[in-house]
Every structure is written in structure tokens, then in C-alpha cells.
Amino acid sequence: MHIARSLGGNGTHVTVEPRSEHADVGLKNMERARASWQEFPSHHHVHGPIEEVVDEIRTHSEFFDAIILDLPQHPTAINAVASLLGVGGRMACYCPVTSQVELAWEAAEDAGLSVEWAGELMERQWGKASKGGMRPVNGPFGHTAFLLIAQRTSIE
């Protein structure tokens, strides 16, 4: 929904999900957002594994500015959809483990994309210090994601 909000009324937002139970929840949330926001992008949902629905995705736009992949296995998806990115378009991959970051990196390069950044995001709670000011609280750190960001710099 955050992506839809950033696109505003002039954007095109395409979601792809192969699992009906996940799609149903997401689509209900999108409808609630559409009903409560003044501007909402043109939204299209495509059902199926992303590798198998590229032609249907392409019916909504020839090129995309961004693609976000949240999958357990990225290489086949990257290979399938990298051509959907316009020049300057970026792909973000949420990876469950570091070995998947490496495989996503290799797949992105093989697909003609340039890896801009790869790393881990962490959650760290802050609180008031006893003598004033703010500081990280003592305690466990929360892992939020391994990410890889790649960009299409040219169309070959």
C-alpha cells in the first residue's frame, strides 16, 4: 500500500501473487486504501508465478520504473522480468538468507542489470538515556531483511 500511495493518481501499480490466500488479503487492503485516499494509482493484479505471467504483466505497461521481488528463490524471476525495467528502472530483491543475495546478485548481472547495493537492514530500538539524550536500548537487535538493489542502465 505504501507503494500505491507514493505513485499517486497518475501511476500504474501491478501486483503479482501466485497464492490466492495471500492475494485475497492484499487485495482487500488495497480496496480499503483506494476507498480512503483521494488519489490512487491504476491497480492491476496478476495471479500466478511471476515467471509464468510476464506477457500478462506487459499488457499493463511496456516498461516499469521499479520491480520488487519478495521470493524464496530469485534467479528465475529476475531472468523473467528484468526486461520489463526501463532504462534507469530499479529492481529490489528481498532475500531470506545471504546465499539468496549471492544468487540474486549473479542473476541480476546475468540479466544485464548493475547491482547498486546489497546488504542487511536491522531494527534497533532507541530510548531516553538516564542522563539525558537518546541512545540505542540494550537488548536484541531485530533483523528485518537482506536486500539487493539493481538497476537497468541500458537496453541491449
Residue ranges and their predicted role:
Residues 10-11, 89:
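A short helix->loop->beta-strand "cap" motif at the edges of active sites that frequently abuts
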